[in-house]
Regions:
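Helix-to-loop junction immediately C-terminal to a conserved catalytic motif
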Residues: 75, 392
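Conserved ABC ATPase "signature" region
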Residues: 142-159, 443-458
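Conserved ABC ATPase signature
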Residues: 163-167, 171, 462-466
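ABC ATPase C-loop
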Residues: 180-181, 479-480
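Catalytic Walker B motif of ABC-type/P-loop ATPase nucleotide-binding domains
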Residues: 188-191, 487-491
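H-loop/switch region of ABC-family ATPase nucleotide-binding domains
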Residues: 223-224, 522-523
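Conserved beta-strand-loop-alpha-helix hinge in the C-terminal portion
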Residues: 243-273, 541-576
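Transmembrane alpha-helix interface motif
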Residues: 580-622, 626-628, 741-828
Length: 828
């Protein structure tokens, strides 16, 4: 057996970063257009841009205009990873991107994509951040330091050893940011990097970006809401719906001189300009117009204005003399009074008394009579999505009382229209038009919804082929088409441009006018304060979430000044000082058992000859002895109780079942069927049970990730295969959860209802094809994430742990093989 591989292999002579450092033009784009192979049309229309070192450039434009395509080209994903080609010129420090190598691109550019789920490529938060650094062959000590530094910067240091799939969507987005920060690139490319992050986290993130630019890092960012980053933006590239350049220049030049064109294109304007009179942008007055919130004296609402640290807060919008204000209330109860006016008759659409999702969401109480628009706000991980899932019957919850339209809430009881955080999970039909027709919606109504949500051109397309923004609009339209009295929306404005967001809010107003109740989870506090009737503000997450600041709890300091009508409380994301004081949690240690000190491959090497012996000797006494010995070894391995019991019981159950099947089958010699040649019924049944027991012995205490590391370090398997295997293992949890969500979505939509007891079977089979499509799409996104993280930059990589082959491993293997030889000679 070869010796363990060195921890940090010497990298091949590193290629110099692209171009000469003295060249101030880090990015030079001339006449860029992109063609995805297999499509007729081109994306982008001869876009040109020059981006200097340490400069911040924002790319803005309506949904679908090609912003993501442009930044993918900047990272080299186009044309190196995606089947595509480009016309024009795209240079990084003077080197054409099409001619650059993986190594040079990885050392120059770090990319954060739109989907936080695609950022998960390993099984722990630590390993995800370490992944690109290992690929770049950095020393272990430097990798450890960078990982901890990056996780502190994004507020995830307490979750360092957690499974990324246990994080909320916003926390996974923070994780993706940490990966990019750890790479310390010359150019940081951010594609809507804060779309799933809470308001305080967004503010902290852009403060971090400001410090990076001060140290020389260049940044290209796509974000609909530029206000948090506007003070540090050097130039803006504005595109129209066709991917053609509207303007390139300083923020003031672009937003002031092209305001009307940007508004017509559906671009989010800075807050200071949204209500400004067009006359202000003419003549000499234009340079004096405020552009940033600071210049205009606008205070953007913060989580600290709404949320407490340890209790749920309820706020209600009150209207007096046409003036709106927000007031904190002890409870939300609109059964008899709504918007300050008595109802014609008392009614109840939603009644929640101390509803909670244990371990995931705090207790919430609401009594709604219909026609409300309620926002759930709070930090990442506070439980917003969990509460909506409980209302929709997707997760278990408990409450003193929980009803929707008089019917009890519970898992499996789908009483509300639910718009998933990931819209792809809720689609049940093969075309956009058919999706809206589920539930018997008339063709006329389908046409209206297609027009209203700008999906007419996509009527015959499969829902899973839509862009992110289009899929989000379709997900909302499907719930509207079903005429539910209560609709819950999980981040419905995520990825939407200004026009689509405004249209969605107008449509929700129409639903309210019909007496329907809308409950929305959102990170957009300004949206909630402007459009909602009530707000439920959740406290910070119990772990890895938020900590109170003393000056806020005392009612003084920067957050003491509150917006009109909004009570100040005291919750904030940990600041740098707090994070620096947080110790790094120790790495969880596996339970000590009989095999803990062995190399993960030792047991596999030991049981192989035993398996051969079972096949060759066909002796039921031997098989029973192996079953008994395996049961003892499984107990000695000291895995979790559940895993131990299952691993001990399963082989014996299989043995009994197979013995019964073989013995009660057809006895006529001419039609007898045997599996290979394991002998009679008892020998065959015990043989199969023994083989299963041996497999379980070798795997009951072995972590799959540790086995892969052993193969790549001790046995020199190409690390690319190992990394792909690790990513596949990490995806297993997501794969299972997706399958559950797809089946649940079909239950929510009433699919299979007419089949009665067979409905679960119909939903199960109907979910297989969408699951395959989602799996392929997710695999493609993960592959892009891996490619953007220096995957394949070198032939070797740094391994963070050793898996040496010791004398004890030789002893166990040799002893087992000797015992097999003796037994074979005795029984043969």
């Amino acid at each position: 057996v070869p010796e363990s591989a060195p921890a940090a292999p010497a990298a091949p002579e590193a290629e110099q970063p692209l171009g000469e450092p003295a060249d101030p033009a880090l990015v030079s784009i001339e006449g860029l257009s992109v063609h995805y192979l297999g499509r007729e049309s081109w994306v982008l229309d001869s876009v040109s841009l020059t981006h200097l070192r340490a400069q911040v450039t924002a790319i803005i434009g309506p949904s679908g205009c090609g912003k993501t395509t442009l930044v993918r080209a900047l990272c080299g994903l186009i044309p190196h990873c995606l089947p595509s080609e480009y016309a024009g010129s795209l240079r990084l420090s003077g080197t054409e991107v099409a001619d650059a190598t993986v190594q040079t691109l990885a050392q120059t550019v770090a990319y954060v994509g739109q989907s936080p789920d695609a950022a998960v490529v390993t099984r722990t938060v630590h390993n995800d951040v370490a992944f690109p650094l290992q690929n770049l062959c950095l020393p272990r000590s430097e990798i450890t330091a960078r990982v901890e530094e990056a996780l502190r910067a994004v507020g995830l240091i307490e979750r360092i050893w957690d499974d990324p799939w246990t994080l909320s969507g916003g926390q996974r987005q923070r994780l993706a940011l940490a990966v990019a920060l750890a790479m310390r690139p010359q150019l940081l490319v951010l594609d809507e990097p804060t779309s799933a992050i809470d308001a305080t986290g967004r503010e902290d993130f852009y403060a971090l970006i400001s410090s990076l630019t001060a140290s020389g890092t260049a940044v290209v960012v796509i974000d609909h809401d530029l206000d948090p980053v506007l003070p540090i933006i050097d130039q803006v590239l504005a595109l129209n719906a066709d991917g053609r350049t509207i303007a390139v220049g300083s923020p003031r030049e672009v937003f002031m001189s092209h305001r009307r064109e940007l508004i017509d294109a559906g671009v989010w304007m800075p807050r200071a300009l949204r209500e400004a009179d067009d006359d202000l942008f003419l003549g000499a007055a234009a340079p004096e117009v405020a552009l940033t919130c600071a210049e205009a004296g606008i205070r953007v609402p913060r989580l600290a204005d709404l949320c407490a640290h340890n209790e749920v807060r309820y706020l209600e919008k009150q209207v007096r003399d046409s003036a709106e204000s927000w007031q904190r209330v002890e409870a939300i109860d609109t059964r008899e009074v709504v918007a300050g006016r008595p109802r014609p008759e008392a009614r109840t659409s939603v009644e929640l008394v101390d509803l909670e999702v244990p371990g995931r969401a705090p207790r919430v109480s609401l009594r709604l009579g219909g026609g409300e628009f309620v926002a759930l706000v709070g930090p990442n991980g506070a439980g917003k999505s969990s509460i909506l899932s409980a209302l929709a019957g997707l997760v278990r919850s408990r409450a003193d009382k929980a009803t929707v339209c008089g019917r009890d809430v519970g898992k499996g009881r789908h009483l509300v229209g639910y718009v998933f955080q990931n819209p792809e999970h809720q689609f049940v039909a093969t075309t956009v038009g058919a999706e809206l027709a589920v539930g018997g919606t008339s063709l006329e109504r389908v046409d209206e919804l297609l027009e209203q949500f700008h999906l007419t051109a996509h009527r015959g397309h499969h829902p899973l082929t839509l862009s992110g923004g289009q899929a989000r609009r379709l997900s909302v339209a499907t719930m509207v088409s079903e005429e539910r009295d209560v609709i819950v929306l999980d981040e419905p404005t995520y990825g939407q441009d200004w026009d689509n967001t405004c249209e969605l809010m107008d449509f929700i107003d129409q639903l309210r006018d019909q007496g329907r109740t809308v409950i929305m989870a959102t990170h957009d506090l300004e949206l909630a304060l402007e459009h909602c009737t009530h707000i439920v503000a959740l406290p910070g997450a119990p772990r890895g979430g938020t900590v109170p600041l003393p000056e806020q709890e005392a009612g003084v300091g920067d957050d003491a000044d509150e917006p009109s009508g909004v009570p100040a409380t005291g919750v904030a994301t940990p600041r740098a000082g707090d994070l620096d004081l947080m110790p790094v949690p120790p790495r969880p240690q596996p339970r000590r058992g009989l095999f803990t000190s062995l190399n993960p491959f030792t047991l596999f090497a030991s049981v192989l000859p035993v398996m051969v012996m079972v096949f060759a000797l066909r002796n039921h006494h031997l098989n029973l002895g192996i079953l008994l010995a395996a049961s003892v070894l499984i107990v000695a391995a000291r895995a979790s109780l559940r895993r131990t019991v299952a691993s001990v019981v399963a082989p014996w159950v299989v043995t009994a079942l197979m013995t019964w099947i073989f013995s009660s089958g057809v006895h006529h010699q001419e039609t007898a069927v045997r599996l290979y040649d394991l002998g009679d019924a008892v020998t065959g049944g015990t043989g199969i049970g023994a083989l299963i027991a041996l497999v379980l012995v070798s795997g009951v205490s072995t972590d799959p990730g540790a086995l892969i590391r052993t193969l790549t370090t001790t046995f020199r398997m190409p690390y690319r295969l190992g990394a792909a295997g690790t990513a596949a293992i990490a995806f297993i949890t997501r794969f299972h959860d997706d399958f559950v969500l797809l089946r649940t979505a079909r239950a929510l939509r009433g699919v299979g209802g007419r089949w009665g007891l067979l409905a679960p079977v119909v939903r199960w089979t109907g979910s297989i094809l969408p699951l395959m499509i989602l799996a392929i799409q997710h695999a493609e996104r993960v592959a892009l994430s891996m490619d953007s993280r220096a995957f394949g930059a070198h032939k070797r990589r740094t391994e963070m742990t050793d898996a040496p082959w010791r004398a004890r491993d030789w002893s166990v293997v040799v002893l087992t093989w000797v015992l097999v030889a003796i037994t074979w000679k005795t029984l043969h």
